[in-house]
Amino acid sequence: MRAQSLAIVGIDFPNAKGPGRRFELEICRPGEPIELRPEPKNPFDEHAIAVCSCRGIQLGYIKSERAVFIGTLWRQGHTTTAIFQALDATCGWLRVAFDGKVPTLPAVSDDAAGSDDSGFFPDPVYDDD
């Protein structure tokens, strides 16, 4: 089975204790190990899978439709290994590999690496001549 990138959702909800989810995501580095924890007693979703940093801080959850898929694989005896991939404006991303394989970060295209979407465009500087 091929490695997959999965969204980490719920990143703006507060944690019961410790630092906030978005703060913890901000200090995660691409390639850091990520822990996936099933939450069968979650009152909102019995298939919920919490995503935690290598420091044990909850980052959010895997989207519900992907959580059902991952949970089914676990029940069938498959294993998963996950790493932090990236953070964007609305969610975090993790990379997961299956059955003892090590996840690797996807290649970044030259366009994505060089783009500047900061919204800051300085005024041109003209010579006084």
Model regions and ranges:
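Conserved active-site motif detector
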Residues: 1-129
